[in-house]
């Protein structure tokens, strides 16, 4: 099956009280948007969403099985709203897609090998956390990965160094910085040395003459 299956029902657009009632009943309101199409308000079960997200994440294709519709709708999640305190899902925006048309989308960058950098005494300075790509919906990767373990202090990883799967084109400038490896700052080193000297002075004062 292409895309993770999600069950949904169409809903009427009502007042905020109705939306609050949905949330209390463990249902999540959502809207499906599409190019040249009217927005479709739907509701989904929070439990099913949490299960799918925990196992597969929220990126990639989702096949929406809408009650009363004969065919599933292929979609991507464009926005997830969560309660800032509890972290619970409160609203989703879906984008309907045509599997025969390429789409622009942002994809996260996953860095590996930071422990090796730290062993060398380097400090990771992260750059872009995501890049823009162009591909068919079914080829959209969950993330793009990069191994920084071989980088030395003073070296930089660029967008051009990312591992890109077949069928995916990166639109972000190739020279944009993904990560830089820095040396510990002299200022920090100086502060540490000063603290050590102060500690030695205190110990000297405590010793009896």
UniProtKB/Swiss-Prot annotation:
Q: Which GO terms describe its cellular component?
A: cytosolic large ribosomal subunit
Q: Where is the composition biased (Acidic residues)?
A: 190-209
Give the InterPro entries listed for this entry. Rbsml_bL25/Gln-tRNA_synth_N, Ribosomal_bL25/Gln-tRNA_synth, Ribosomal_bL25_b-dom, Ribosomal_bL25_C, Ribosomal_bL25_long, Ribosomal_L25_dom, Ribosomal_uL5_bac-type
UniProt feature coiled coil, ranges: none
A Pfam match: Ribosomal_L25p
Q: Which UniProt keywords apply?
A: Ribonucleoprotein, Ribosomal protein, RNA-binding, rRNA-binding
Is the keyword Cell inner membrane in the record?
A: no
- Write out the GO biological process terms: translation
**The keyword Ribonucleoprotein is assigned to this record:** yes
Picking any one GO molecular function of the record gives: structural constituent of ribosome
Which cysteines share a disulfide bond? none
- Write out the ranges of the annotated region (Disordered): 185-209
User: Where on the tree of life does the source sit, at the highest rank?
Assistant: Bacteria
Family affiliation: Belongs to the bacterial ribosomal protein bL25 family. CTC subfamily.
PANTHER family from the entry? RIBOSOMAL PROTEIN L25/GLN-TRNA SYNTHETASE, ANTI-CODON-BINDING DOMAIN-CONTAINING PROTEIN, RIBOSOMAL PROTEIN L25_GLN-TRNA SYNTHETASE, ANTI-CODON-BINDING DOMAIN-CONTAINING PROTEIN
Question: Subunit notes for this chain?
Answer: Part of the 50S ribosomal subunit; part of the 5S rRNA/L5/L18/L25 subcomplex. Contacts the 5S rRNA. Binds to the 5S rRNA independently of L5 and L18.
What is its biological role?
This is one of the proteins that binds to the 5S RNA in the ribosome where it forms part of the central protuberance.
> HAMAP family under this entry?
Ribosomal_bL25_CTC
Report the protein name in the record.
Large ribosomal subunit protein bL25
